[in-house]
């Protein structure tokens, strides 16, 4: 259980910006199409 935060925090720190970037790029692509 002690190793969980040291693995979980960088994982979330990498995954959340990746999801934000992906949704942002999809939003920009939709705006370019319409």
UniProtKB/Swiss-Prot annotation:
It comes from the Eukaryota. This is Photosystem I reaction center subunit VIII. The keyword Plastid applies. GO terms for biological process: photosynthesis. The keyword Transmembrane helix applies. It comes from Castanea sativa. Pfam families: PSI_8. Belongs to the PsaI family. The chain crosses the membrane at residues 4-26. May help in the organization of the PsaL subunit. InterPro entries: PSI_PsaI (IPR001302), PSI_PsaI_sf (IPR036357). Keywords: Chloroplast, Membrane, Photosynthesis, Photosystem I, Plastid, Thylakoid, Transmembrane, Transmembrane helix. Its main location: plastid. It is a single-pass membrane protein. One of its GO terms (cellular component) is photosystem I. It is found in: Plastid, Chloroplast thylakoid membrane.
């Amino acid at each position: 259980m002690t190793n969980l935060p040291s693995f979980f925090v960088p994982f979330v720190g990498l995954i959340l910006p990746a999801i934000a970037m992906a949704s942002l790029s999809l939003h920009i692509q939709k705006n370019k199409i319409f």
